[in-house]
Amino acid sequence: MSFNVKFWLKLSLVNLLIVAMLGVLMRYKIGFDFPYFSQKNIQHAHSHFAFAGWITQALYVLMIHFIIKKNQFLDTKNYNRILVANLICSYGMLFSFSYQGYSALSIVLSTITIVIACFFAFFYFKDLDKIDASNPSKSWFKAALLFNIISSVGTFYLAYIMASRNFNEHWYLASVYFYLHFQYNGFFIFTCLGLFFSECNAIFPLFKYD
């Protein structure tokens, strides 16, 4: 099964447009009456869809593109399935959070995205091991995927707080910031650095790692 990187990147940009529209809606509700959606629910939908449907989806696509360039005979069937599953869950969270906020459906969908992340890490680690050990991107991508999985601890605890109605502001903020820290400063940055180093030879001809 072939991998159409242009299709997946265009779809990720469509998701970015949806994220932007939700952002505009939230700001509109601050100054004007729009009773059809709860501001808090839209905020949850915006953040979850931005992370899963836009940023994570786009980073997955770029990481897969990197691995394909290193192995043209790579079977991308599992990666296509992972991207489809992640996309379905992202849109599911978009609608479930918008209408219900934290509910059984939205919690299940957010949990599934974590499972998907684990599957992606499993397959990607296997394919990374087939690449030349001198490639500097390998270590960055491995660290990025580990941070992505570690961040799920915050998500699980946040889901527990919301499902049990046992709200504690300190633990709520701790779980949110734990997740955000390992996403922003871990998964996102380390993936971007891995992508940067993968193109260093093209961007800076004098830079050589092999």
Model-assigned labels for residue ranges:
Residues 1-210:
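Hydrophobic alpha-helical transmembrane segments of multi-pass integral membrane proteins
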